[in-house]
């Protein structure tokens, strides 16, 4: 947990969110870090921990819900007999006291760390925050989110645009937190100057006054409520279980009133009421009451300090040294003995007789059949269509898949930029970008631009990159939905360079935040790009090369803006061509009628002019890099390809992945090493990696990776242990699929040529795993380890201590 929170405190965006809560609620539990402040965690005693846990993690302080097609009496009886009856009732006062509203707006200044040699100009976060209302107000719960979108978040929204036009920060974003007892609204200008604080506040407050005086855009209100209503009716939680997500939403009210668990789940009536109020002064009145007249506000300014992480580490070392100096020899020896006992406990496996008490499925209980594709080829050779006949509850899921294989190397990285432009919107031939955004949400459930890379299942050297334009809609809106996609893909106007710069700056800021919070993903894809064609292609659009291009374009925008516009126009001519397009559609048969005709109308307007086609071939070479950050932890990746060493992919590797994640890597990298997590992957194309997450170590972790093959070859698993790992592997394969996900899964099989026969063979191999088969898989691990591809993202000083590991080291974020 200590290293988890050191990692969390290394992300400036996380620091800002934390300080916002502290600024608004200084006298309540919301003003404290629930995960633990790493500067304070060393002060926690074991006795305090046990006392807290015994009081608050007691069933008397729990909320229990049931979900699914079940007999409540049966399950409640089981819970009572097997669990609750074992405890005495305990009176626990866990009610969250409310923060007394401020008499006047507060101003809070805090700091975050950047690299020691960072100039730290224009890297300040300016935030304006307002506490408002109660999470038990079912209308305000949704209306706050509506106002966030309409005023401060959507493309062209008035408060956001006013700040952008004034040049305050390179990204402006806002959100509302409605799931706490005292909800709040926050708007942030990222990468601003501290000197802009007063202007930042005055622009927001002046713009809010204008909004009340002149009124809110009714079409924007309708579009936002339509979007919320579509999302509510669709109830698509992706790979997350529906019952879990509904339970979490129930907590937004249930935690604060035990009689109101369902008020936010039953949102349909609330949405209808809010729609009826669009033509009234309801929303302007909310702005006046909560945004303008309300004094419970905090302006939180978080400024960069070069080398702050190092200074804090030195302060901690001095504190611990002082504590050590005050200890007697007996006290020191007691600490040494306790540490040895802890290490012994960490290495000691749980007794098998205890593990045997846990109920376990048997292999024969598990589904034998692989999940089937739902694919039907329709259309024609000139206008191919892939259809997934799946019940969707009245929603059509359309995916226009454009082959990007023939985009020249000089234009290929611009695919990522084009994707962000189509997501954040530019003006088109027939709409302003804000009007287009509203039209999309009024007539559809939204659009999404996706870059994918499909690896051929029969020839792993063949990859097909695609640009995919997706939308979803009610069946009677299919023509309008396709028309709006056409507007984006064909009629986009790239000549507004001011808007282009705004998008580039926001895209760069978003990438930076993602790279800081998901360093493990960054390190893994970078390490694999040294040898893997598919990873190298992906990295050009989603990885470090994309970020470097954004750095260059934003830094030298005036010199490069004409080149940027020309490249975007040329890229569209390579991508959006009739011969590149596959119509991919998910709906039941009654929703199919007319979709081919609608897409054919778009197809006829695609580019047909002559171009010099070439196949994009990325360069792969060993680089073994270290990327230096101001963070307090590392993300350590070691990668390679076992198929190149003559070893096959087998379904048993899915079982090994689970075993490594819950056994060897869990115990050695997390439990013993102190990292918050460690993951591994074994791809069908042979690409494999180990990567740690929020890791205090570097070389120690790499040594642990290097010993993995010997551990696997020597492990002695029993049938119960193997079955546990098989269950984990099956659960990953059999995650419930929504209709949209089932369609995308089926498309993946079609694009890669991965047959059902091969999928079934892999599942059979998975279910037939024995201890001996697991031992044999140590060869695959040894094979990819021998290739020694390494990438580490982490603390600059820590990486410099291990510089001999790297062929190159550079700062991840340049000034």
Task: Give each language-model segment a name.
Residues 1-52, 142-145, 149-162, 170-174, ...:
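Acidic/histidine-enriched segments that form metal/cofactor-coordinating
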Residues 3-21, 28, 39-44, 63-66, ...:
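Non-catalytic accessory/assembly modules
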Residues 68-72, 132-135, 188-196, 208, ...:
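A generic structural motif
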Residues 118-127, 135-137, 161, 368-413, ...:
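Active-site-adjacent "gating/activation" loops or surface patches in catalytic cores
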Residues 127-132, 152-191, 445-454, 639-641, ...:
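A structural supersecondary motif
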Residues 139-151, 394-439, 483-486, 648-660, ...:
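Active/ligand-binding-proximal structured segments within catalytic/core domains
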């Amino acid at each position: 947990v200590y290293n988890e929170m050191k990692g969390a405190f290394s992300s400036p965006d996380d620091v800002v969110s934390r300080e916002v809560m502290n600024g608004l609620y200084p006298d309540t539990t919301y003003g404290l870090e629930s995960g633990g402040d790493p500067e304070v965690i060393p002060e926690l005693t074991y006795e305090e921990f046990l006392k807290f846990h015994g009081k608050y993690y007691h069933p008397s302080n729990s909320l229990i819900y049931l979900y699914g097609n079940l007999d409540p009496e049966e399950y409640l009886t089981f819970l009572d007999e097997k669990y609750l009856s074992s405890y005495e009732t305990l009176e626990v006062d866990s009610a969250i006291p409310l923060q007394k509203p401020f008499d006047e707006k507060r101003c809070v200044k805090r700091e975050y760390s950047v690299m020691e040699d960072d100039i730290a100009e224009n890297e300040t976060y300016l935030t304006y925050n307002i506490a408002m209302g109660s999470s038990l107000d079912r209308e305000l719960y949704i209306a706050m989110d509506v106002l966030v979108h309409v005023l401060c978040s959507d493309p062209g929204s008035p408060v956001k645009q006013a700040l952008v036009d004034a040049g305050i920060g390179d990204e402006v974003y806002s959100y509302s937190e409605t799931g706490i007892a005292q909800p709040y609204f926050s708007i942030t200008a990222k990468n601003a100057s501290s000197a802009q604080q007063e202007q930042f506040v005055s622009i927001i407050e002046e713009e809010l006054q204008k909004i009340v005086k002149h009124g809110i855009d009714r079409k924007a209100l309708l579009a936002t409520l339509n979007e919320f209503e579509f999302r509510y009716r669709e109830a698509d939680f992706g790979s997350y279980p529906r019952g879990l997500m509904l339970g979490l939403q129930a907590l937004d009210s249930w935690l604060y009133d035990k009689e109101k668990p369902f008020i936010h789940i039953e949102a349909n009536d609330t949405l209808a009421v809010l729609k009826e109020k669009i033509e009234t002064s309801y929303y302007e009145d909310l702005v006046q009451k909560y945004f303008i007249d309300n004094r419970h506000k905090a302006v939180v300014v978080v400024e960069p300090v070069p080398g702050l992480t190092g200074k804090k580490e030195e302060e901690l070392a001095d504190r611990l040294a002082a504590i050590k100096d005050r200890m007697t020899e007996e006290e020191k020896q007691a600490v040494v003995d306790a540490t040895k006992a802890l290490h012994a406990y960490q290495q000691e496996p749980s007794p098998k007789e205890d593990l045997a008490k846990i109920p376990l499925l048997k292999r024969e209980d598990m589904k034998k059949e692989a999940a089937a594709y739902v694919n039907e080829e329709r259309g024609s050779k000139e206008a191919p269509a892939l259809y997934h006949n799946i019940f969707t509850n009245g929603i059509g899921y359309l995916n226009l898949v454009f082959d990007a294989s023939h985009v020249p190397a000089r234009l290929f990285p611009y695919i990522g930029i084009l994707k962000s432009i189509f997501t954040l919107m530019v003006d088109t031939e027939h709409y302003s970008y804000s009007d287009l955004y509203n039209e999309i949400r009024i007539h559809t459930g939204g659009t999404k631009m996706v870059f994918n890379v499909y690896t051929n299942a029969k020839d792993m050297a063949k990859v097909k990159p695609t640009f995919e334009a997706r939308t979803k809609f009610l069946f009677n809106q299919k023509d309008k939905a396709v028309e709006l996609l056409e507007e984006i893909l064909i009629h986009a106007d790239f000549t507004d360079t001011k808007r282009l710069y705004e998008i580039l700056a926001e895209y760069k800021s978003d990438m930076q935040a993602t790279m800081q919070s998901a360093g493990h993903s960054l390190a893994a894809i970078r390490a694999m790009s040294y040898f893997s064609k598919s990873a190298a292609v992906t990295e050009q659009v989603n990885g470090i090369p994309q970020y470097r291009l954004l750095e260059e374009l934003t830094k030298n925008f005036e010199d490069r803006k004409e080149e940027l516009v020309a490249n975007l126009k040329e890229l569209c001519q390579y991508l959006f061509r009739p011969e590149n397009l596959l119509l991919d559609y998910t709906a039941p048969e009654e929703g199919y009628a007319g979709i081919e005709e609608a897409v054919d109308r778009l197809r006829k307007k695609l580019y047909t002019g002559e171009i010099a086609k070439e196949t994009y071939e990325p360069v792969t070479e060993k680089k073994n890099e270290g990327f230096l950050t101001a963070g307090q932890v590392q993300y350590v990746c070691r990668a390679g390809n076992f198929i190149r060493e003559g070893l096959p992919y087998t379904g048993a590797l899915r079982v090994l992945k689970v075993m490594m994640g819950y056994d060897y890597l869990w115990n050695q990298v997390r439990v013993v090493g102190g990292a918050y997590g460690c993951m591994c992957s074994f791809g069908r194309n042979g690409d494999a990696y180990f990567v740690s997450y929020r890791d205090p170590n570097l070389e120690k972790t790499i040594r642990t990776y290097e010993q993995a093959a010997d551990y696997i070859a020597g492990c002695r698993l029993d049938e119960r242990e193997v079955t546990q790992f098989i269950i984990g592997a099956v659960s990953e394969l059999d995650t419930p699929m929504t209709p949209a996900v089932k369609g995308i899964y089926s498309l993946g099989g079609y694009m890669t040529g991965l047959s059902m026969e091969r999928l079934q063979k892999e599942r059979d191999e998975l279910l037939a795993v024995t201890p001996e088969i697991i031992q044999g898989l140590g060869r695959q691990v040894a094979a990819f380890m021998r290739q020694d591809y390494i990438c580490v993202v982490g603390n600059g000083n820590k990486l410099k201590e291990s510089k001999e590991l790297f062929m190159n080291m550079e700062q991840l974020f340049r000034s």
